[in-house]
Amino acid sequence: MKNRFNGKVVWVTGASSGIGEALVCNFMKRGSTVIASSNEPAELDRVLKNCVGLPGKMICAPFDLSDTSGIEQIADEQVATTGGIDYLINLGGISQRAAIVDTPLWLDRKIMEINYFGTIALTKAVLPHMIRQKSGHILATSSISGRFGFPLRSAYSASKQAIHGFFETLHLENKKNNIRASVIIPGRVRTKISLRALDAQGREHGKMDAGQEAGITPEKAADQIIRGIIRNNREILVGSGELIMLYIRRYLPWLFFRIADRIRST
């Protein structure tokens, strides 16, 4: 089977751990040049050392999604360095574990700033370059909680639902430019997302949710994402049995609300 990623340039945010790290290694095995971004430079260096010997190339480009002021310059620099971006995979983000009544507005804004505005800022910075090269594929990460509300995740769910609206519009506006847009919808994946989720004081939750612990590995999630890219899927579902909640919410909403009322971990 032809390797469509050999020699391609792939930009991955959230690349210092979890699904992002697994994607970096997967694409490098396929011969891609991977721009790896995160707000943790030391962890990016660790990923780079772990990928030594793979046929692809990794470029470390650390930045913080919560500070959008310099993103356009970073994008211009990476395009100049690599000659162009073929795939942009927005994985960086933050989750939440706090009830609405306990969550201050500044925390809602912070989560939205990282998950939504940070993602679209990088997307808008890369898009003109893709339009000029008349090709590209931009992906953003939502969540199954981006398809429905869920307890203790109000701002997180809202930020992920906003991603769907933006990227559906991105796809419709740029199909004529030969640019695709897709949304990745993860369920339970064994990453640090619940450990790093923010509580009502903006501190790390520090606990691994039982559902997260039982989830698929980041490596399997990366395989599912790449398979979805190859198939040109508009929505790429990542996970296993928990994804049935998407269908229950759509076709049996009464059952969904009964189940969601009892579940506190995803």
What function would you assign to each model-found segment?
Residues 99-100, 107-109:
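Substrate-binding pocket helix/loop in short-chain dehydrogenase/reductase
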